[in-house]
Amino acid sequence: MKYMITSKGDEKSDLLRLNMIAGFGEYDMEYDDVEPEIVISIGGDGTFLSAFHQYEERLDEIAFIGIHTGHLGFYADWRPAEANKLVKLLAKGEYQKVSYPLLKTTVKYGIGKKEATYLALNELTVKSSGGPFVVDVVINDIHFERFRGDGLCMSTPSGTTAYNKSLGGALMHPSIEAMQLTEMASINNRVYRTIGSPLVFPKHHVVSLQPVNDKDFQISVDHLSILHRDVQEIRYEVSAKKIHFARFKSFPFWRRVHDSFIED
């Protein structure tokens, strides 16, 4: 079996990575960071997100595993003290694949510029580059509202536990193939109105943001933020692709939520 291990880069994570590579050396395991079948992330959720995007073109061939070396990582099932056990289990190849939905976003620009497509594990947020953020929200080609505020966040089910949660969005179980749109400081008065609530969209729904005035936006895909100019449309939909996790033990989603936000 081919595997690779990525580390947060701190001393604790780097040492654990080296120890695991040495442990895998005792089994029929090949280190391959080009075409791995297993990707192990050591660190926190930021490290995991980086690993996801590094291999997002090979998601169907990869199963991910997270080991948290700091605060509890939402995508990490394992602690450093369990690393030796994980090595032995992986060497046996006895694991189940659990899949989570992802978010696909297409950004369309003015004439002459090729559109860009992004895949998000947590969320994709859109904000103004400086001026007022005003966009028309269109759902399945039907105009829904004109939004004015700081920005909008579209999240995956697993991503609802991230930025979406801080915006007051609902938490969604990742078995639900859907996406959730939450507002960032919307303007609501006698003149301007928005729905003022998070919106959950099922698979096959398409949500479009169409600029009204300013067409330059700061778009963040998970942990990566880029300024996009001359944006004509931003289209969200549940991706046909999924991320796969290698699971060796039961760790129910709501137990994960409990341990992350209430108590460990």
Tell me the role of every PLM-derived stretch.
Residues 47-52, 161-165:
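Short glycine/serine/threonine-rich phosphate/pyrophosphate-binding segments
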Residues 41-43, 66, 155:
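Short beta-strand segments
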Residues 30-51:
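Short, well-ordered secondary-structure micro-motifs within conserved domains or adaptor modules
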Residues 44-47, 70, 158-160:
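Short glycine-rich anion-binding loops that position phosphate/pyrophosphate groups of nucleotides
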Residues 24, 55-58:
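Active-site catalytic pocket residues across diverse enzymes, especially alpha/beta-hydrolases
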Residues 63, 157-158:
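Proline-centered helix-kink/hinge sites
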Residues 60-76:
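Short, acidic/small-residue loops that bind anionic groups at enzyme active sites
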Residues 1-36, 72-153, 161-264:
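Catalytic phosphate-donor-binding core of small-molecule kinases
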